[in-house]
Amino acid sequence: MNEEITVEELREMPQGEYLLIDVRDSAAFALGHIDSAVNVVPGQLGEAQLPMDKPVVVCCRSGIISDEIAAQLREDGYQAANLAGGYVRWLGQKIALQSSADRAAEIERSITKKFHRSIFSKFAKAINEYELLKPGDKVAVCISGGKDSMLMAKLFQELQRHRKFPFELVFLVMDPGYSSENRAIIEANARLMGIPITVFETDIFNSVYNVQNNPCYLCARMRRGHLYNKAKELGCNKIALGHHFDDVIETILMSMVYGGQVETMMPKLHSAHFPGMQLIRPMYLIREDEIKHWARYNDLSFIQCACRFTDTCTTCNPDGAARSKRQEIKQLIAKLNEGNPQVVMNIFRSVENIKLNKIISYKTPDGEIHSFLDGYND
């Protein structure tokens, strides 16, 4: 067997005559994988009982780490080959094979029919309840290429068809230094889904690539600044980000567990550095599981994180352990949810029902600290 096979060659191989193992972490695998692939993280390969009598094809995100693993398996006597270009290349070809016109209509119907209650109604509820849109707004719908932002774009299109007042939309994609394959996947998905994107380029990935301490935080801050700046240049007064309900819950717990404070991700914010601009989060009430269900139902595949770190698989943990504090919190919430399915909603409600007279101390927006001892003996 060749040391490397292409995506085209893999498609020609009869299923059952080979084993395809995906060595990405479980979170990436769950968001999308090649049909028939089995998830085996590198640290578990010794326990996987791989077959000696048929080919083993190894896949990672971009074909880099999987190449090293396939070479090691060959040394151990297996008929192992690396999938050239990895999952990203397979995904790009899958999207290219689909028919845009019919698929876009099917995707739109799914939003208004099957997912009307679980997704579109919650989108509209957040818009109304948190007053995210006003007549005359021009919104930059910020698209990263992932499932959340792509769905948000379709929801905004649907909302505009039934609008009660006039507002404008710009579907804004910032390329911070994507690989050519990741850029192609974003553009192909946009064509497939009927989203007219406006793309602009920055060099953010180059700027943060060698940063040792918390490069993801710096990258996020820089990306938001560039999005605000481009949106303002295009005449927008708001940018929309695709954070969903689960992001909100995770942020609440992260602020407590790692930050020592009670703070949440707000549904809208005034920009501190771009006067007159606001950030809105219209996916605020939509559960991530429903977004995943929508993507699976429509056979849609999206990039998870297209930064240069994940391009080279350097963030893949050998033992499949959590890669970030947010992933650790996700796992904690999943564990809590096993014993009490209401725990997630209760966390959300807790920040809607804060009783200041039951808080030891709190800060006002200007930083002034108030203690429960203030006026205690009055």
Task: Give the location of each predicted region.
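The feature marks non-catalytic terminal segments
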Residues: L300-D378
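Short, basic, helix/turn surface patches
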Residues: A105-S110, M222-L234, P267-F274, I329-S350
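ATP-dependent adenylation/nucleotidyltransferase module used to activate substrates
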Residues: S99-M254, Y258, V262, M266, ...
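Catalytic subdomain that performs nucleotidyl-dependent activation
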Residues: E168, D247-E328, L332-I333
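Rhodanese-like catalytic fold shared by cysteine-dependent sulfurtransferases
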Residues: M1-L19, D25-P55, R61-K113, A188
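A structural preference for short, hydrophobic beta-strand core positions in alpha/beta folds
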Residues: N39, N82, F171, V199-E201, ...
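A short acidic, helix-capping loop that chelates divalent metal ions and anchors anionic groups
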Residues: F29, L91, N206-Q212, C313-T315
